[in-house]
Amino acid sequence: SIAELYDMQHEPDTRELLVCHSEEVGQEVGRAFQIPRTADDLRLKREAYFAWAQANCGMVGRSPDFLNVMLAALAAKKSFFAEDSAERANNVFEYYRFVARNDLFMTHALLDPQLDKGKLRNEQSDPAICLQVVDENENGIVLSGIKRIATAAPYADELLVWPFPPTFQR
């Protein structure tokens, strides 16, 4: 089960492999959150992923590490986000720290609904069905519409929603 994978991070036989200290977060975190700096860091990450895969016989398609790795990669490239906005770069990095600090399970919602698969999002008979920002105010953004394919949504702590694939271009 998912809980058993998290429990492995506290078991004496697997803790050292599955948990490491993160300078970015300032505490111990699950190995998937580690931003690797050496070949040995990468080797340990691979071994940690393999240990979780072995523990569930490879039968958990969306284990907690799958998006944690992606979030660590985004945090590692904070400079990329800073090219557009220092605030955005800080938000990405602080979100990584929040998720890592709390060892949260994330999933994602990727795709727009398609009423007609031969048409792009803006060409659909009802393009408003697709998730979109309809307002921005002091509290953040206001969304309307839907995204689909959120595989681990029933048991995830956090849901990442992003514009994938590009939906206004051919």
Where are these regions (language model features)?
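Intrinsic structural disorder
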Residues: 1, 141-144, 170
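Internal helix-loop-helix
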Residues: 3-106, 152-153, 158
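Generic alpha-helix signal with a bias toward terminal, lower-confidence helices
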Residues: 14-17, 111, 118-122, 155, ...
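Short, surface-exposed linear patches
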Residues: 19, 28, 128-132, 163-166
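Charge-rich, low-complexity amphipathic helices
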Residues: 20, 24-27, 117-122, 165
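Gly/Pro-rich turn-and-neighbor structural signature
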Residues: 76-144, 149
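A short core secondary-structure module
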Residues: 146, 150-170
